[in-house]
Amino acid sequence: MLIRCFHIKMALVTCFHSMLFLSAVVFIFSLDVNIRGVEASHQVFPELQSVSAVNVQLVHRTGYHFQPKKHWINDPNGPMYYKGFYHLFYQYNPKGAVWGNIVWAHSISKDLINWVALEPAIFPSKPFDKYGCWSGSATVLPGGKPVIMYTGIVTPSPVNTQVQNFAVPANYSDPYLREWIKPDNNPIVRARSENSSSFRDPTTAWFDGVHWKILVGSRRKHRGIAYLYRSRNFLKWTKAKHPLHSKDRTGMWECLDFYPVAPKGMNGLDTSVTGQDIKHVLKVSLYSTRYEYYTVGEYDRDNDIYVPDNTSVDGWAGLRYDYGNFYASKTFFDPDKQRRILWGWANESDSKQDDVQKGWAGIQLIPRKLWLDPNGKQLIQWPIEEIQLLRGQNVHMGSQVLNTGEHIEVKGVTAAQADVDATFSFKSLDRAEWFDPNWAKLDALDVCDWMGSTVRGGLGPFGFLTLASEKLEEYTPVFFRVFKTKDKLKVLMCSDAKRSSTTAEGLYKPPFAGYVDVDLSDKKISLRSLIDNSVVESFGAHGRTCITSRVYPKIAIYNNAHVFVFNNGTEAITIDSLDAWSMKAPSLMNNN
């Protein structure tokens, strides 16, 4: 039946209908189950967490993404710009390649590309963080003085009682901020009536002229909650009478982020900026699904209430920064270039045994600049401009027609480590397939799973075959498929790892997908992919939809990797322009 559904279009429709009930049932039971959007960051492997790497394997290790020299990393923490340096703290296991022994590792950079690792900034050492120093944020106070707030664990697993602590630099004149002090009056925020084992990840604070305010993520049964706290001096905090926002059937909210966005233009705003036309973004990382969701809405500063716009779906069906392997993200305002920058973590999709063997696990994705789409409904994301410093050999293609079933290789670049940016066009929208209304009840990845890159369509599938072997035994397709409904077009974007590796066992190879809110009246759409050995970060329609995949090819590695442009729709596709660059490694990557 599966083979028939995959190859026969009419059977596909039947299979979709038969799966609707199953999908609904699966969701009901998924609230407390990890469905591996990203694997749990706090999953414990006691027998592995202190197994230090002897040899670091380079196969599948990224060439230009942020990684420590070895071992495990997860959440980005407290990013900021201070005295000419970008600072990134991150959850790190100095003793092994799985989660455990977590400290706040610390790296600095002048350009967000080249990084120098310093000594860990925060590590368990006092009663208020004896059993762990978990995620948090940085705030720059008046006078340019940074302060970190983080979650401390005060009882051992499985209880993991959580409190909120602060730390300050030992020397404000040190631009490297090499040493941090944890004052003895910690913790400064304790759970009272809140769930103390689900109470973590304080946000960057904002100032309303009288009070500093932060959010702490939590839950009450299946309701996700953003608790709000106020302080006049950043030391004594009082919980507000009501949360800033909450939502039923979403489970634990962790790694919250809350910040303003300008209604027009691409510049970012300081976290404390408010105004009549200013929109706000609330992002939550859902522990139950391992995906992140955000809404765009209005912040009532006087009453400390956030209300998502009517056009912004609140909950598990809402907008995501990234529809793939992307979690625990954190933004910060860069005052040097007046932009808001997004950091996100991508975990591995292989086995824990693989991670221990190769000696490392986890990467931080390329930082992205964020701004509000002119339509006001969603964010646009784009790799920071500094990534262009790593571009090498360039190849250009233009006015190239792709007929049904054709694929063309992009030659002349290192396909295992490349930046590929293309604009596609088509003469007509008439051949777009009809979108069955019942499919709206399915997640986009279900549609992608059944209607993949090899299933003949009308307008699409078309896009890239990344990290591909010469004979296509392995490849990770990133592509669009255009559907039509009675009143509009619906664009599906996919990054499908099912054929990414001939390795049969131990790998998680899912299809990831999201819909693209884009105007196709000019019959054009763009696609950009950052390819780096075991990661493919893709940006559809100039960053309106983003998808990250982690893949582990067995054949398509190093010089045996290829990248193709393909079309498997009946409508001919034109490559208006395509530029591809070989990507060099940074000169400095955490002392590696």
Curated annotation (Swiss-Prot):
Top-rank EC class of the record's enzyme: hydrolase
Signal sequence bounds: 1-40
Positions annotated with a glycan in the UniProt record: 171, 195, 310, 347, 568
Catalytic function, reaction form: Hydrolysis of terminal non-reducing beta-D-fructofuranoside residues in beta-D-fructofuranosides
InterPro entries xref list: ConA-like_dom_sf, Fructan_Metab_Enzymes, Glyco_hydro_32, Glyco_hydro_32_AS, Glyco_hydro_32_C, Glyco_hydro_32_N, Glyco_hydro_beta-prop_sf
Protein location: Secreted, Cell wall
GO MF annotations in UniProt: beta-fructofuranosidase activity
GO terms under biological process: carbohydrate metabolic process
Keywords recorded for this protein, A-Z: Cell wall, Glycoprotein, Glycosidase, Hydrolase, Secreted, Signal, Zymogen
Gene3D superfamilies: Exo-inulinase, domain 1, Glycosyl hydrolase domain, family 43
Coiled-coil residue windows: none
One GO CC term on file: extracellular region
Superkingdom as given in the UniProt entry: Eukaryota
Entry-linked PROSITE patterns: GLYCOSYL_HYDROL_F32
Pfam families per record: Glyco_hydro_32C, Glyco_hydro_32N
CDD domains in the record: GH32_Fruct1-like
Catalytic machinery residues: 75
Known EC number: 3.2.1.26
Its job: May play an important role in phloem unloading and in stress response.
Membership in a protein family: Belongs to the glycosyl hydrolase 32 family.
The name this protein goes by in its record: Beta-fructofuranosidase, insoluble isoenzyme 2
